[in-house]
Amino acid sequence: MNASDRTPAELLRTALSADPARPLLTYYDDATGERVELSVATFANWVAKTANLLQDELSAEPGDRLALLLPAHWQTAVWLLACSSVGVVADLGGDAARADLVVTGPDTLETARGCSGERVALSLRPMGGRFPQPPEGFADYAVEVPGQGDHFAPYAPVDADDASLALPDGGELTGAQVVE
């Protein structure tokens, strides 16, 4: 970590420049036996593609709120960093009806339908697989993200002192607080 790293996205960029091959995230699913290990470079690529999807396809802007209705999963970590990259506030377990966008897994589709904005669904299947039948009214993340760019540049600078993460207890953290 550099003293200049003030947002999670900046922290990831520093890790990528230091040692892109280093393992960064290991995910285990005891129910399915799935194990996923992502290097810094692979994780950063998923984040870049997801941030491009957010910014270019879903028209998300800094300050927008994204209700993140996902369980503890490696793809949840990707979405958290992608939101930070764009300047979107990731609202963990947030109210879909009050959010500008919603990202959901298969178990929270009905709750996510309350969002009048863009809706993205993740199957949470091994290796980031697609839904066998895409849920009506949702973009299937596994279909939409592969074609996105491998590098991300925000249209507007992200301020480390702006809200970055909304917590289930109602508290909020800035990007700088998340890094601390």
Feature annotation, model-predicted:
Residues 25-60, 157-180:
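Conserved AMP-binding/adenylate-forming core of the ANL superfamily
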Residues 17-18, 59-62, 94-100, 113-116:
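Flexible, charged surface loops at secondary-structure boundaries
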Residues 101-180:
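ANL superfamily adenylate-forming
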Residues 2-26, 149-160:
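A short N-terminal helical cap/helix-turn-helix that marks the beginning
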Residues 36, 53-93:
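Conserved AMP-binding/adenylate-forming
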Residues 1-8, 29-33, 42, 75:
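Long terminal accessory regions outside catalytic cores
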Residues 24-27, 62-72, 102-104, 165-167:
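Short hydrophobic beta-strand segments
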Residues 70, 91-101, 106-108:
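ATP-dependent adenylate-forming carboxylate-activation enzymes
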